A protein has these predicted regions:
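Core structural elements
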Residues: 1-4, 51-53
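Histidine-centered catalytic/metal-binding microenvironments
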Residues: 3-7, 11, 22
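TRNA-recognition modules of translation machinery and tRNA-sensing kinases, especially anticodon-binding
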Residues: 13, 17-313
């Protein structure tokens, strides 16, 4: 029914003189139409191939791969920070390569104290060390801000130790609260709130006398064991976690020694007017207790069988 074939069929009916010219014109037109159709067909085929190969940018990037998560140490540190931020503390930070002055001298640590020995501290030179605790951050915070001050100092610290419960590099969170009328009862109340937030609402804390150069009095702080009842399991056996004591050693603390305040007296810390408490804990230790990790080195071995047990929260 197309017009061109019908026209070509009428050629025999034409005068002989007209047949050749009209036939040639008709064939030329048919050739042009066929070539145009072939080109169009090729374009459509190419478009279909392109559509098959097109990338849908709305699809997930790698749906078959498991999503990573925060490392257990990072998550534990964040949990600790959240507790103290909720209690009104602020986060303070400082350098990891620190002055001996801020690491020891300002913290009432005598020149003969064993912690200053090269067997216990990484020395860069005679005046500079890799910090052995984040306490220098507290000194810097007091120099930068007059009282009252409530800060925590999380960060990496370094000591030449390497065994199941010690690594050359680990993480601490230390805290400092200085104001008028701060007492040991305030310290205990703060740490009780921390213990219940981290280890459970039924926990209690026990303060045992101890010695630290920068606090007086000084205490070791234990948390009631959450794995047993007063040191014993339901079957009557001794608790493997607390070794039957009913308590778990968690951190060290105490009231800031007046000699520390005397070092920063010119910045508003008159030991006759202000008092304060300080505390410090190892993040790895907290994570070990919360999650039953037996060896500190597991945190840093990069073993995915271990790391995948602790997903993001």
């Amino acid at each position: 029914k197309a017009e061109l074939p019908q026209l070509l069929r009428t050629i025999p009916q034409l005068e002989p003189a007209e047949r050749a010219a009209i036939g040639a014109a008709g064939n030329a037109a048919r050739g042009q139409i066929e070539r145009a159709l072939e080109l169009k067909e090729a374009d459509l085929a190419a478009g279909e191939i392109a559509a098959d190969d097109a990338i849908d940018v709305s699809l997930p990037g790698a749906p078959s791969l498991p999503v990573g998560h925060v490392h257990l140490i990072t998550q534990t540190r964040r949990d600790i920070e959240d507790v103290f931020l909720g209690l009104g503390f602020q986060v303070a930070e400082g350098p990891e390569v620190e002055l001996v002055e801020y690491t020891f001298d300002a913290l009432n640590t005598d020149v003969t104290h064993p912690s200053r020995a090269r067997t216990d501290t990484f020395y860069i030179d005679d005046d500079t060390v890799l910090r052995v605790h984040t306490s220098p951050v507290q000194v810097r915070a007091m120099i930068a801000q007059p009282p009252p001050i409530y800060v925590i100092a999380p960060g990496r610290v370094y000591r030449p130790d390497n065994d199941a419960t010690h690594t050359p590099q680990f993480h601490q969170v230390e805290g400092l609260a200085v104001d008028e009328g701060v007492t040991l009862a305030d310290l205990k109340g703060t740490l009780l709130a921390f213990a219940r937030a981290i280890f459970g609402p039924d926990r209690d804390v026990l303060l045992r006398p101890h010695f630290f150069p920068f606090t007086e009095p000084s205490v070791e702080v234990d948390v009631s064991c959450f794995n047993c009842d007063a040191g014993y399991m339901r079957d009557g056996s001794r608790c493997p976690l607390c070794k039957g004591s009913g308590w778990l050693e968690v951190l060290g603390a105490g009231m800031v020694d007046p000699n520390v305040f005397d070092y920063v007296r010119e910045y508003g810390y008159d030991p006759d007017k202000v008092t304060g408490f300080a505390f410090g804990m190892g993040v790895e230790r907290i994570a070990m207790l919360r999650h039953g990790v037996p060896d500190l080195r597991l945190y840093f071995d990069g073993d995915l069988r271990f790391l995948r047990q602790f997903g993001a929260r």
